[in-house]
Design a protein with these regions (language model features):
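Short, low-order "capping/linker" segments at domain edges
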Residues: 103-108
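Short, flexible turn/loop "capping" segments at secondary-structure junctions
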Residues: 1-6, 53-55
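Active-site-flanking beta-strand signature of metal-NTP-handling nucleotidyl enzymes
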Residues: 5-13, 61
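Short amphipathic alpha-helical segments
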Residues: 18-45, 83-84
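Short, solvent-exposed loop/turn elements at beta->coil junctions and helix N-caps
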Residues: 46-51
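A general secondary-structure boundary signal
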Residues: 19, 23-27, 58, 96, ...
């Protein structure tokens, strides 16, 4: 397996009652489509131990990507991101998303 030199973390929160719909979308093809993008080598999904202050369940996706250039290519694919936004539209009020990315600067 290729090594990940760059990482994308997508934190997201799902409103009570919305988890089945959101996870069905993710597991039904969204994650696989992201993983087909050049340079994406692995993904982990986390369920956070505690909900947020409003009771929304907290989750995160951690994607291992070969290089920053692969990440930039993915982020520059506006058609793909528009497609994802369109797919999320039916449950947009049940989902909050925050993204951040970077390289490891410490590991033990």
């Amino acid at each position: 397996m290729k090594e990940a030199g760059f990482f994308l973390v997508v934190r997201f929160w799902i409103a009570p009652g919305g988890e089945e719909q959101v996870m069905r979308w993710m597991d039904g093809g969204h994650i696989a489509e992201v993983m087909r993008q050049p340079g994406f080598v692995w993904v982990k999904r986390l369920r956070m131990a505690e909900p947020d202050a409003t009771g929304w369940s907290a989750h995160a996706m951690i994607y291992g990507i070969e290089t920053r250039a692969h990440y930039d290519q993915y982020m520059g694919n506006h058609a793909l991101h528009a497609k994802f936004a369109n797919e999320r539209a039916p449950f947009a009020t049940k989902l909050r998303i925050e993204r951040f990315a970077g390289e490891v600067d410490f590991s033990k």
